Swiss-Prot record:
This protein is one of the early assembly proteins of the 50S ribosomal subunit, although it is not seen to bind rRNA by itself. It is important during the early stages of 50S assembly. Transmembrane segments: none annotated. It comes from Ruminiclostridium cellulolyticum (strain ATCC 35319 / DSM 5812 / JCM 6584 / H10) (Clostridium cellulolyticum). This is Large ribosomal subunit protein uL13. Part of the 50S ribosomal subunit. InterPro entries: Ribosomal_uL13, Ribosomal_uL13_bac-type, Ribosomal_uL13_CS, Ribosomal_uL13_sf. GO terms for molecular function: mRNA binding; structural constituent of ribosome. The keyword Ribosomal protein applies.
Length: 144
C-alpha cells in the first residue's frame, strides 16, 4: 500500500462562514487555521495546500479573556530607525478588529511560501455582511 499524496490540481475547495461573536480569539484562530491548512480533510498532505476558504464575520465581537485587552501588545516595525511601534489590543480592537483575527491565524500557519498562499484564503469582516455570495459558502458552527 502506497502513501497517498494529494495533487494541487485535484483538491476541491469549499467556502465556509464562521461567526466570531462571543468566541475566544485563540480558540477561533486555531480552528480557522486548521481548516485553512486542510487538516480536517482525509487527503491532508503537509507540502500541498489542501485547505478551504474561510470567511469570518463579526470580528469586532470576538472575546479576549482576562486582562488581555489592556496587557497584550501588537508590536510592529516601520522599517525606519527607531520605528518599533506598540499598540494595545484594546486600541487594535477599536480601530481594526479584523486585524486581530488575521494576526492570530497568520501566526498559526507555516512560516513559508505555502503558509502565505494559505493565508490568502482567509477573509475577515466587521459585521455580518460579506461579498462572497457567488461562492455559495456554508455556515460552519464551531463548538468552542
Amino acid at each position: 500500500m502506497k502513501t497517498f499524496m494529494a495533487k494541487p490540481q485535484e483538491v476541491e475547495r469549499k467556502w465556509y462562514i464562521i461567526d466570531a461573536e462571543g468566541k475566544p480569539l485563540g480558540r477561533l484562530a486555531s480552528e480557522v487555521a486548521s481548516i485553512i491548512r486542510g487538516k480536517n480533510k482525509p487527503i491532508f498532505t503537509p507540502h500541498v495546500d489542501t485547505g478551504d476558504h474561510v470567511i469570518v464575520l463579526n470580528a469586532e465581537k470576538v472575546l479576549l479573556t482576562g486582562k488581555k485587552l489592556d496587557q497584550k501588545l501588537h508590536r510592529y516595525h516601520t522599517l525606519h530607525p527607531g520605528g518599533l511601534k506598540e499598540i494595545k489590543y484594546r486600541h487594535l480592537m477599536e480601530k481594526h478588529p479584523e486585524r486581530a483575527i488575521e494576526l492570530a491565524v497568520k501566526g498559526m500557519l507555516p512560516k513559508n511560501s505555502l503558509g502565505r498562499q494559505m493565508y490568502r484564503k482567509l477573509k475577515v469582516y466587521r459585521g455580518a455582511e460579506h461579498n462572497h455570495q457567488a461562492q455559495k459558502p456554508e455556515v460552519l458552527d464551531l463548538n468552542i
